[in-house]
Amino acid sequence: MEPGDTPLLLKRVDPARNMNRFYHLSVEPTLFGGFAVRRTWGRVGTWGRTRLDLFADVTLALAHQQKIAAQKHRRGYCPQ
């Protein structure tokens, strides 16, 4: 599995609560030989916020991506 092969787009929609959110996860190489898990989240239609989590090894980065995806799935986010 290579970085960049597994971008995930998760959405959570609940019209009764006026909720329309997205969560995007991707693993990307950094300029210095490491890897970053890029998380972007917010309301659909906005730029959202972004956070980078840095890792020295691609397997650690991919494991972190899957851990976050599992947490979001438990909170009601679904893959798109």
Segments from the language model and where they lie:
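Short aromatic-glycine-(Arg/Gly/Cys) micro-motifs in beta-strand/loop hairpins
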Residues: 25-51, 66-67, 78
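Short N-terminal "domain-start" leader segments
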Residues: 1-36
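A short, charged, amphipathic alpha-helix used as a generic interaction element across diverse proteins
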Residues: 47, 56-73
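A positively charged, amphipathic N-terminal helix/segment that binds anionic biomolecules
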Residues: 19-20, 75, 79-80
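Short, intrinsically disordered low-complexity segments
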Residues: 11, 38, 71-74
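Generic preference for hydrophobic/aromatic residues in regular secondary structure cores
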Residues: 9-10, 59, 77-79
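A generic structural signal for ordered alpha-helices
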Residues: 3-6, 15, 39, 43-46, ...
